[in-house]
Amino acid sequence: DYAHLCKTAQGITTEVTATPRTSCERYTFPAGEGHIILNLGQGLTNESGAMVRRVSSTEVEGMKLLGTFCYTTQAVFPIYFVMRVSREPSTAGPWKFQPKLQGVESAWSPDDGTYKLYENYHREIAGDDIGYRFSYDDLGEGEQVTVHMGVSFVSIENARMNLEAEQQGKTFDQLRAEATAQWNRDLGRIRIEGGTPDQQTIFYTALYHALIHPSIISDVNGEYPKMESGDTGKADYTRYSVFSLWDTYRNLHPLLTLVYPERQTDMLRTLVGMYEDWGWLPRWELFGRETYTMEGDP
């Protein structure tokens, strides 16, 4: 996929593309100072907590805890990442939000209730509201910085493996072209005739949305988090996640059976695998956890 975002108020142009298990972002800056900020702080789920560690001047690795949605269960699971920037930064380091202190303690801390930057700290840092920054002091007009990110639900090592396998040192433009070609192949499995251009756009937009979830959760080596336990399993097929089955059994999965049978087959094998992991078929599964969100059974 490819998304070209408009310029920000600071004049920064952002472009984003992806592979099944990695992402690539390209930032075009105006002349002067620029920053790449990794935010591992509070999210939209019922869990917080993260860790980030410096690997080199242009690479960090770490993890973030996630929870389920709608606050239905107290499940927690990690997502691991490896992040690289294409240009050597002027300065770099972790940051952390310092909670507001009470009484005389607040007068002792210059970072009270603000974000503290760690200039000369190069080991791991952990907490609820943390991140990492790459700062550039001398960017030329139109200079670009590319960010490469690999993720895994199993380990940092697998996140790095996914990044190496799926990006292989390719440029943003190469990855964008590959993503565009893949989406054209996927959407091109259905050819429509007639209708207005707007109606055709609506149709292919809906088909695009239908292919977003369920999404791949297994790594390039076949490893994945087992249902509920989170232990590492290994499959000889592509393992999927995000099964909103009460919504999708009526129409999405029949569509996949007709048009994308190889994906539907792997999804069915995934559901059987979840039963083997857990002893139950899922109702509304999210990243290896049962959310129990919807009534009844699919």
Where are these regions (language model features)?
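Aromatic-rich carbohydrate-recognition surfaces in CAZymes
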Residues: 241-298
